[in-house]
A protein has these predicted regions:
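N-terminal Rossmann NAD(P)H-binding glycine-rich loop of SDR-like oxidoreductase domains
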Residues: 1-25
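SDR active-site strand-loop-helix element
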Residues: 6, 30, 77, 110-115, ...
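Oxidoreductase cofactor-interface core, primarily capturing Rossmann-like NAD(P)-dependent enzymes
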Residues: 16, 23, 40, 121-235, ...
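Conserved glycine-rich Rossmann-like NAD(P)H-binding loop of the short-chain dehydrogenase/reductase
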Residues: 25-33
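NAD(P)H-binding glycine-rich loop region in Rossmannoid oxidoreductase-like domains
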Residues: 35, 43-105, 115-120
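A short helix->loop->beta-strand "cap" motif at the edges of active sites that frequently abuts
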Residues: 104-109, 141-142
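Glycine-rich portal/gate segments that line the openings of hydrophobic small-molecule binding cavities
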Residues: 338-339, 346-413
Length: 413
């Protein structure tokens, strides 16, 4: 069974692909930049995995469909929420180009992971865009399965990392009114379970042309999620609700207090006043699995972080994670017309120790010279709309092309 995964370098894609391969599926991973895909993590499945390059915002960059095998299922995991104010237009264009690209090819099923958008409520640009993408995908010839998720909790997810940033760093929080909004957080493990279940050959016909809400076993407010994290960590935190923080001020609060970018903070805040609880739960009967509680999700995420086994993080998945091809063309040091200055020094360390030290730069390790100046540089970066130094790095010892490294982006590793 051949499965196409778009957004394969994203937060969900990098967690879904190993599970698909483990189950014996042949996977076509579609990415914008092959250099960013961690192919070294898939050595044992290299016979089942093909990585293809293409940008759905640039239809001319997509590979010819006659090079594709018949596709039994295609996961649509693309989003542009971190791209700025024009992300709704970008998301619609991506969906239209996806449908147009696969139109000549036999396709058994499309699976789309979106967000819960309550009927009868005025939607934010973020949630309206998610609903628009679903409508565009439904115009294709293949049956569409739409999964609508509430807040996804897992190591490296935007929601988990924002909550962790706030609770770990702020003993006292003055929180906006939207922290009393209800949601139904779901563990990333359960999300992957549902994504796998809807293409299972003996069950998939139950999900054709259907929309299914997925959530965890608890209804919580965002304040309860902050308090729940503090309880798991054994931290005393005081939360003081403030009714007068505007959406713009709330976005700035998230931006300066966490590692999130301002476009993402603005998009998130615009949706956080809307309740995202499941309106139906049919999928729990069709795909039975043990749903982790919010506390269990946090404990599992913290365990993965502590063991340095985080396979993907949200800030490596945004549009900014794509390395411009112009940078790649200029990666080689020129041989002519430059002054070459070569220096040597003797170190009381083995070759491997030196290599490990270089690959561990940044993040919690910091920088070996004038570390305070790098932190000052991070503050300056944050003040002009950059990411600052808070996002650190995905793994303390490993780097891949496209990874975030404090306020840097790795262009070759």
């Amino acid at each position: 069974m051949n499965v196409l995964v778009t957004g394969a370098n994203g937060y969900i894609g990098l967690r879904l692909i190993p599970q698909l391969l483990e189950l014996g599926y042949s996977v076509i991973a579609m990415v914008r930049n092959k250099n960013r895909f961690p192919i070294h993590n898939f050595e044992s499945w290299k016979q089942q995995l093909v990585v293809m390059e293409g940008d759905f915002l640039k239809p001319e960059s997509l590979p010819a469909t006659d090079t594709l095998p018949p596709i039994d299922a295609a996961y649509y995991l693309l989003h542009s929420m971190g791209a700025g104010k024009n992300f709704p237009e970008q998301e619609q264009s991506c969906a239209e180009n996806f449908i147009g690209w696969l139109k000549p090819s036999p396709l058994g099923q499309v699976v789309y992971l979106g967000g819960i958008s309550p009927h009868g409520s005025e939607l934010s640009d973020h949630l309206e865009s998610r609903a628009t993408v679903a409508r565009v995908l439904a115009t294709g010839s293949a049956p569409l399965t739409t999964l609508r998720a509430s807040i996804i909790v897992g190591s490296g997810s935007a929601s988990f990392e924002i909550i962790r940033d706030l609770v770990e760093k702020l003993p006292v929080m003055s929180t906006p009114k939207w922290t009393r909004t209800k949601c139904q957080p779901i563990a990333i493990r359960n999300v992957i379970g549902y994504l796998l279940g809807v293409i299972e050959p003996t069950k998939k016909h139950h999900f054709f042309n259907g929309t299914f809400d997925i959530g965890g076993p608890q209804l919580l407010t965002y304040q309860m999620m902050l308090e729940g994290y503090a309880e798991v960590r054994g931290l005393k935190r005081f939360i003081l609700p403030v009714p007068f923080l505007s959406p713009k001020l709330s976005a700035y609060w998230l931006y300066f207090m966490t590692a999130t970018s301002f476009p993402l903070a603005r998009a998130l805040v615009s949706s956080l006043h809307i309740e995202t609880t499941c309106e139906e739960s049919r999928i729990t009967e069709l795909i039975p699995q043990e749903l982790l509680s919010y506390q269990e999700s946090i404990e599992l995420a913290l365990s993965v972080v502590a063991q340095n086994r985080v396979p993907s993080v949200w800030f490596n998945s945004l549009a900014s994670g794509n390395v411009d091809s112009r940078h790649m063309r200029n990666i080689q040091i020129p041989e002519h017309g430059v002054l070459q200055d070569s220096r040597e020094t003797t170190l009381a360390a083995t070759r491997q120790e030196v290599i490990d030290a270089v690959w561990s730069l940044g993040g919690k390790t910091g920088w070996p010279s004038m570390d305070w100046a790098w932190h000052l540089r991070g503050i300056m970066d944050k003040c002009v709309g950059g990411s600052g130094i808070r996002r650190g790095r995905r793994d303390p010892k490993q780097l891949s092309t496209g990874d975030a490294l404090d306020f840097w982006r790795v262009i070759l590793a």
